[in-house]
Every structure is written in structure tokens, then in C-alpha cells.
């Protein structure tokens, strides 16, 4: 029987995932505590707009797609204290709050780290410095898509990819919120209609087309797995796809996905919850 094998949220966009025993799905369809902060380029410290919603394209801030070395950092966020702690190679780089002084210190440390990485030239492009740490540390708002969504993939799909690659692939490369076990490989790509995780009801939306972030080793930050070309050339996909987007249901249909929308029921999903679909 398909069930939840692992749950993740990513408090700071592009940085260390936090493994959880349970996650709260907010009425707006986003995961509480997921992507509540982001390091943005100077020219992109305010949101763009898409379909009437705030949109924060990952190409305009620190993200693994362009800055794979970020994966080598170990970042933790204390939501109650509003405090960010960043470590590298067991060395504490910074431990600061989200007040004005703390945000400046965090941005300074991240800037220094990236400028000392192989991707340093990318950060020196016009309009990118100084970095800005944006977000209130509470509202989930920096997902890749304006509408938010919950992301899910199956362990079997990752195992099939590992076989085609000839090396073991870590689930964390895909930065999904929900990892399921007990389903056949690639089943999630064919889901239609309602998907239920525990007591929370979703509607299956589009499959997730992957980017270069998946090439980065989640421990070292080195691009050591050609995930995209393996999905297309070896596994025959038209686009490099792994995983599915889920939209929270409401009595009126799907929620809008706007930050703070309260039309959905929300709820809690837990490791071990049964997953039904179709």
C-alpha cells in the first residue's frame, strides 16, 4: 500500500532540507515553515507577479540550480526564535536573528561563501549584489511556482533513476515535501483527479520538470550525477520529469494558492500516512 516514507520542508529557499515526522498543510495549500526565507539578488528583492500572484523566480536569487556549492552548507532555522544558523565543515559561520543587523550579517556571510566558491563569477554579475535576505520567517512564499503547491515523488521512481544512472541517487536532490513508498516507479506521473494523503485531500496537478539543482550532491555541492540527460536519453522522457505537484482541495474546488488564502481545509500529514490516488 502506498504510504508516506519521508517528509521535508526547506525553511530557506535553496538551502538545507529539514526532515520532519509531520507537516502542516496550510489552508492556502502550502507547507507551514517551507521556504519562508530567501536570499535574493539586489535587483529582485521585491516579487514579480504572475496570474495575479506574487512570484519569486529562483533564477533571481541563491538557488542550487545556479549555485550548487550551497548544498555543502548546513543551515538550520528556529522559527520560534526567528534565528538562522549556518555551518560549513563543522565550522559555525553565523548564528543570527532576523532583525535588520542579523539579516545584514547573514547576507554578508552568504556573499563571502559564494564568492569563495566555483560559482563566484555568477554572483558578481550586474544587479546581483548586495544580497537581500527576504521573508518574515513565518509565511511560506518562496516556492518555485506562484501558486505554491505541495511536491511529491516516489522512492521507486528515484530507484529506477538510480539504476539508469548506475549510482545511488539521494531523495534530497529533488527537494520534494513528500516522499512515498509502496507505489510503482513513475506512477505519480499518471495520477489524475484526487490524491489523498492521510486525511488531507489534494488534486493532482502537473508533473515536475526538473532542473540542474538535481545534479548537485546534497552533501558536497558537487555536480556528480547527470540526472536530466538520464531522464530524457536513457529513460526516454520528453522532458526531465520526476514527481508531481499537488493542489489542496477546498469545498469550492482548488485553492487559489495565494499566500494567506484560507479557502482550503488544510490539515496534518504524517510519516506512515496512507496515500490513495485515482
Where are the regions that the model predicts?
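Metal-cofactor-dependent catalytic cores
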Residues: 1-278
Amino acid at each position: 500500500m502506498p504510504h508516506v516514507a519521508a517528509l521535508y520542508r526547506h525553511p530557506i529557499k535553496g538551502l538545507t532540507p529539514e526532515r520532519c515526522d509531520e507537516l502542516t498543510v496550510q489552508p492556502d495549500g502550502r507547507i507551514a515553515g517551507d521556504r519562508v526565507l530567501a536570499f535574493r539578488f539586489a535587483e529582485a528583492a521585491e516579487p514579480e507577479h504572475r496570474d495575479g500572484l506574487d512570484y519569486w523566480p529562483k533564477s533571481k536569487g541563491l538557488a542550487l540550480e545556479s549555485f550548487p556549492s550551497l548544498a555543502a552548507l548546513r543551515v538550520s532555522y528556529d522559527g520560534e526564535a526567528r534565528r538562522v544558523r549556518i555551518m560549513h565543515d563543522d565550522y559555525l559561520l553565523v548564528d543570527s536573528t532576523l532583525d535588520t543587523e542579523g539579516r545584514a550579517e547573514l547576507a554578508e556571510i552568504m556573499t563571502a561563501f559564494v564568492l569563495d566558491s566555483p560559482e563566484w563569477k555568477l554572483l558578481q554579475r550586474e544587479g546581483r549584489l548586495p544580497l537581500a535576505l527576504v521573508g518574515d520567517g513565518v509565511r511560506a512564499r518562496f516556492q518555485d511556482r506562484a501558486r505554491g503547491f505541495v511536491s511529491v515523488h516516489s522512492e521507486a521512481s528515484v530507484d529506477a533513476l538510480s539504476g539508469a544512472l548506475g549510482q545511488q541517487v539521494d531523495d534530497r536532490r529533488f527537494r520534494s515535501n513528500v516522499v512515498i513508498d509502496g507505489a510503482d516507479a513513475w506512477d505519480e506521473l499518471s495520477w489524475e483527479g484526487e490524491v489523498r494523503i492521510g486525511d488531507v485531500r489534494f488534486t493532482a496537478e502537473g508533473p515536475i520538470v526538473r532542473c540542474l539543482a538535481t545534479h548537485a550532491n546534497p552533501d558536497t555541492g558537487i555536480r556528480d550525477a547527470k540526472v536530466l540527460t538520464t531522464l530524457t536519453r536513457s529513460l526516454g522522457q520528453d522532458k526531465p520529469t520526476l514527481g508531481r505537484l499537488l493542489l489542496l482541495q477546498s469545498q469550492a474546488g482548488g485553492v487559489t494558492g495565494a499566500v494567506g488564502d484560507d479557502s482550503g481545509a488544510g490539515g496534518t500529514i504524517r510519516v506512515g500516512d496512507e496515500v490513495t490516488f485515482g
